[in-house]
Amino acid sequence: MYTKNEILELKNRIIQLEKENKTLHETVEFLTHKLFGRSSEKTSVIAGQINLFNEVETESKPSAPEPTLREVANYRRKKFNGQRAELLKDIPHDTVICGLEEDERFCEKCGTSLVSIGREFIRTELEFIPAKVRVIDYYRESYECRKCRKEGLPYIEKSPMPYPVVQHSMASPSTVAHIMYEKFVDALPLYRQEKEWESLGVKLSRTTMSNWIMVAARDWLIPLTKLMHQKLIEEKYLHADETPVQVLMEPGRKNTSESYMWVYSTYAGSQTPIRLFDYKPSRSGNCPQKFLKGFKGYLHTDCYSGYNKVPGVIRCLCWTHLRRYFVEALPKDIKSPEATLPAIGIDFCNKLFSEEKLLVNLTPDERKMKRLETEKPILEVFWSWANSIKQSCLPKSRLGKAVDYAVKNKEGFMNYLMDGNCAISNNLSENSIRPFTIGRKNWLFSGSPRGAEASAAVYSIIETAKANGIEPYSYLKFLFKSLPGVQFEAHPEFLEEYLPWDPWVQSSCKKKA
């Protein structure tokens, strides 16, 4: 027979094992969803859940009589004839006249020659013209003064030449810009570009293309990103994020080691939008501390503790990130009782985001006042709710982690209320880094630290161009055509007029409407 203490101990053990089993079951569900489920974080209304905010829906009366229906005659959807014209207005047009051959222009009744009486429009086609390449051979003209020559003082002058984008190569501004655009915008790896060039009749190896990218980035793009870095530090509101990247041939590290690409962005209302990528071999907090040296202001991030090393900043944490924790806490069966608490957490976040949408067109001061009026009460209820359920949540469960994540970082989640220019989320930074994560799926790794640094510079230029509303390919081509020959090493101020918000750059590289 068991003693009372042994029975009590066994009961406690059973309770502990049940909790562990529940946590493990939840983990298996979560990982299975990660592998095979949809990646969208959109959530539908959960049957039976307590919705704190949809008062109209919860107070409605299903038994109320429906309004009488009125029959509407069938109709055909109206064609919007202007849409096609607007779509094709900036594309060159050719006209094809379909007429009768000379020997067919006769009347079948009497044999008299036919005369054209006009033409009618039939249709429009969009024709695709494959890419083509051409070779440009540069010759330099030399000029001589015949008079000086006769006097024994020969004078010869040679015409100026455009500087090459890559010395001692056949690379042109358009070629290097195209290779970069394909790799860093369209996420097309160099080995696939190699095949494309071969189909055009050019045997251009991926090694050559890689060298062109690194040299062009080193000579023309990195100096510009350094100037952007100086501008970034002067801002008052920044966003930051980081993502893993595998880099080969790092000194003293295995090729399987994980490195990081950090991205720093100005806030949505900045007059000089900047997106800067920074490759570092680690995720240490020393990385943002060094990069953001001199910055004082609001820093939007997730809850990663490494950002705590950045001195003199007020951290604004991301509510989208917190919402993601509650979404991940939803069980597979969203109609189960276990779904109620995560759903309430999601509802709180959704309500905050709904309120934010109403504040987009307000001034910063108006936005701050409105947030304190409408969002702060929601936040107070949220923190009260989170604290009330914290003790009842299994610490290792998804819901327990979500609640703990929120409560431990309450101050950071509330800081966006301090200034109307602050954002409720770090979506801006996540959107900036997304092209890199998409590209990483295709090219998998960087071949060397130099290659990773070049990639960071190219991504910085491309994403900053997008943020400033200009075409990335046009901007790259513009830089490679204009910067060679500019003495910016001796006069760094010369680079100012090549920044993407400069009126000259804007007019030269603007996107087609």
Regions found by a protein language model. Give the residues of each.
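Catalytic center-proximal scaffold of phosphoryl-transfer enzymes
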Residues: E104-R105, S142-E144, R149-A513
